[in-house]
């Protein structure tokens, strides 16, 4: 670990450098903390010689634009791209646990990987490559250290940290191999075995994927005429031959375009063929001819009642080389056991009859079908609600923006409103129920990198200490969808303003005519736990500050003029471009916290200051 003096800069833009983590072939990796929000990030500072190359920077810019749109646990998500003192740097999520390259991970395990462990790693890599190929990106430049394994709670997760960038620094990678005198030969050979000569985007990845899978199975890369997995691992249940041949085909057009479907189990027929092959090769043994053995014995040794096998019986026995018998019970199986040479003729006849009865019986084979287990869906955590009595109220203000005029009367029916904004622990259950961060119309519900909810190892988790904080990074679609999921709705703009003012006409802030930092969370560095500040006259918490709250209405600049003419339960314009947000947030100034202050944004907009609370009709 190096100190800040070793790095040569205490701050890099808005980020305070904590220490240097290492250096890759194209970046210097630093751990930093944002000076305002106090959150840690991994900064990848571009090396000076690369930053001065105009062709490289143009290609680098194109890759960054594509990567910024991706959202996959196997890719280091880009939070921000900035420049300081002429050096470009990327801001990515902090990795708390060390990351091992694939070869380092395999060396750390004192045994060979099991088939299911190989399936897990290969499935993750295939899913990741299929995803990036669909987005127009590819790894292209491969070696065994291109794949990294992130150990999270003892579970290996596959990551490609240099995805998109490796192809930009091919010459630098080759120079690195040549300068490494100790491992030069093995590294160059490894690169040759992982690449083809076609150079078509995506097909290089397909070939390398097949070669890496082969390496996980055998411990070496395929070269020349190599053995197929079925010849060595006959007891494996997955069809590795199909995957290897689909990826390592000599003809580029025959290589698979999608990788994940290649990971499949063997068919029932293939498994049966393996069983029969194993039986024939390992279970059969030479049985001496009882006729010959009896002929070689003296006549005095032959027991009374024994008869020699006729020529016809011997002939039929030569044709019967192997018989596979399925017994329906243990008793029947025991009946077919080979009797000792001392068995009587009656016992041999009983054995023949038992064997014949098994052979003529219709075999019955039933397929095992695992009973489906219906997993219980997550249940919502409901919020206590406050009843807002209906009546005539005043809304608007003369001290704000033009869209707050005119001050006018509105008539509202009684309704319920949540006492606090929806929290992370409540919203995560909605995401688990949806199974995605998008709704059925592909509208984004939440952007995880702008929230305190993360997806790790395929599971959604909340950052420690943020379960009771209001959910942020949520779109209007996510807020509306959550409300519908629990049988509620979003409040209208009129309902929200009247609820914030506590029913008091012309009240400036929810807590009174003035507001201090002891009364609300504003102009700070982050959200706070809900209900941390005193409630307003209605008993509602966080109506000022903490997070902006989505409302049901479309925003209309002059809608108050229409509302003054039609005061009965106003609900905003019939259509529009923006949806209404109210209440100010943790980084707002005082003016944004006024009860009458209006804010708006696109319904699909994502921000670390946007949250919501729910309302409900009386009936």
Curated annotation (Swiss-Prot):
The active site is at residue 141. It catalyses: L-seryl-[protein] + ATP = O-phospho-L-seryl-[protein] + ADP + H(+); L-threonyl-[protein] + ATP = O-phospho-L-threonyl-[protein] + ADP + H(+). It holds the Pfam family FGE-sulfatase. Autophosphorylated on serine and threonine residues. Its EC number is 2.7.11.1. Residues 15-302 form the Protein kinase domain. ATP binds at residues 21-29. GO terms for molecular function: ATP binding; formylglycine-generating oxidase activity; protein serine kinase activity; protein serine/threonine kinase activity. Keywords: ATP-binding, Kinase, Nucleotide-binding, Phosphoprotein, Serine/threonine-protein kinase, Transferase. Coiled coil: none annotated. The keyword ATP-binding applies. Together with the serine/threonine kinase PknD, may play a role in the specific interactions with host proteins during intracellular growth. Belongs to the protein kinase superfamily. Ser/Thr protein kinase family. This is Serine/threonine-protein kinase pkn1. It comes from Chlamydia pneumoniae (Chlamydophila pneumoniae). The gene is pkn1.
